[in-house]
A protein has these predicted regions:
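PLP-dependent class I/II
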Residues: 1-176
Length: 176
């Protein structure tokens, strides 16, 4: 089950909630993010932010404001993403990828070392490049997010996609 740190008062009082409308609200091309925090934290955040970001285009701001007026759009998101996660995990369970626990996100991490093909011996970044170019499914090596880039054979897939896209990806991944 997905829970926000903002739902826990002690965490909310000392946390920045940083997110993206794109993935959170399933409008992935929009590239608009947001930060929510208590006033004392946002005051400090704005000191840095004002020199890094100028503005977001006006039509996107109006579109998102209109979208947020209907609470059902965001109140139904946990069930929406849980359904996508379950669908994608069930499909991946029919592959040789080892599914890893990844709660509270729209990414599914997998270990590819059990796949019986020569490419499974590639380092994560090279495996992801091969997977994208040869199989047509994009993945990101999790080592890209760590200072210690020791290979772990773990990559992540995003399941914040249309069902047809997920189906096509699963068919390709199941062929490995």
């Amino acid at each position: 089950k997905h829970h926000s740190v903002a739902s826990h008062p002690e965490l909310a009082a000392r946390s920045f909630l940083i997110s993206s409308f794109g993935k959170t609200y399933h409008v992935t091309g929009w590239k608009v993010g947001y930060v929510a925090a208590p006033p004392s934290l946002t005051a400090e955040f704005r000191k840095v932010h004002q020199f890094n970001v100028f503005t977001v285009n006006t039509p996107m701001q109006f579109g998102l404001a209109s979208y947020l007026e209907d609470a059902s759009h965001y109140l139904n998101l946990p069930a929406f993403y849980q359904s996508k996660r379950d669908f994608f995990r069930n499909g991946l369970a029919k592959t040789k990828f080892k599914l890893l626990p990844t709660p509270g996100t729209y990414f599914q991490c997998v270990d590819y070392s059990g796949i019986n093909i020569a490419q499974a011996k590639l380092p994560e970044e090279e495996f992801c490049k091969w997977l994208t170019s040869a199989i047509g499914v994009a993945a990101i090596p999790v080592s890209a997010f760590y200072a210690d880039t020791a290979e772990s054979n773990v990559i992540r897939f995003c399941f914040a996609k249309e069902e047809a896209t997920l189906n096509a990806a699963l068919q390709r991944l199941q062929s490995l």
